[in-house]
């Protein structure tokens, strides 16, 4: 009997990537990483996926690059059929594993659900998603139902100082210098 404790399911889960399609016939799978450097996803262990019965531990046997794809071998997944069962599952870890960020840097997960208000006090709506465009991140903001401009969704660049004037995570508020009609 092993004295080693099994990893605990995430208390504060965060999605770090997604398992893609099967690769080959020996149970390898493509992985799509949400980390800045694709292979940094392996720095965060253990991995979990959500199944019908709850959290399921995913143990990595190995990983490598194949062309531009990152592929993994999951312990106990030895053929294509077993690999296909994991396709499209989100890779989740506990957010306590994430490093602390410096002043003015934020994890996207912390910005989700924040109310976005202009410097003039107009409520633009809530952040429902973030997008990476290459030059800068963009907030996807779901407008309030009674938006005076008839807008349902806004895309606002997350440019500190230029557009984003203040972020207060304790009150879940982001203040922006942005024209509500845009």
Curated annotation (Swiss-Prot):
Single biological process term from Gene Ontology: rRNA processing
Cellular component GO terms held in the UniProt record: cytoplasm; ribosome
Domain called PRC barrel: residue spans: 102-182
Database matches in InterPro entries: PRC_barrel-like_sf, PRC_RimM, RimM, RimM_N, RimM_N_sf, Transl_B-barrel_sf
GO molecular function: ribosome binding
Pfam families, sorted: PRC_RimM, RimM
Record keywords, A-Z: Chaperone, Cytoplasm, Ribosome biogenesis, rRNA processing
Secretion signal, residue range per the UniProt entry: none
Role, per record: An accessory protein needed during the final step in the assembly of 30S ribosomal subunit, possibly for assembly of the head region. Essential for efficient processing of 16S rRNA. May be needed both before and after RbfA during the maturation of 16S rRNA. It has affinity for free ribosomal 30S subunits but not for 70S ribosomes.
Entry text on domains: The PRC barrel domain binds ribosomal protein uS19.
Complex and partners: Binds ribosomal protein uS19.
Family: Belongs to the RimM family.
Protein name: Ribosome maturation factor RimM
């Amino acid at each position: 009997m092993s004295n080693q404790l099994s990893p605990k399911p995430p208390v504060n889960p965060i999605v770090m990537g997604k398992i893609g399609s099967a690769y080959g016939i020996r149970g390898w799978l493509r992985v799509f990483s949400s980390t800045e450097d694709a292979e940094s996803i392996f720095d965060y262990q253990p991995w979990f996926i959500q199944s019908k019965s709850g959290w399921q531990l995913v143990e990595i046997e190995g990983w490598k690059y194949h062309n531009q794809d990152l592929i993994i071998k999951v312990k106990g997944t030895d053929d294509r059929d077993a690999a296909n069962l994991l396709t499209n599952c989100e890779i989740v870890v506990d957010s306590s594993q994430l490093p602390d960020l410096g002043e003015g840097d934020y994890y996207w997960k912390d910005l989700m659900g924040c109310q976005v208000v202009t410097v003039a006090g107009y409520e633009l709506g809530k952040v429902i998603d973030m997008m990476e465009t290459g030059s800068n991140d963009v907030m996807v903001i779901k407008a309030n139902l009674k938006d005076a401009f008839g807008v349902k969704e806004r895309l606002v660049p997350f440019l500190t100082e230029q557009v984003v004037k203040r972020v207060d995570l304790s009150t879940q508020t982001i203040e922006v210098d942005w024209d509500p009609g845009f």
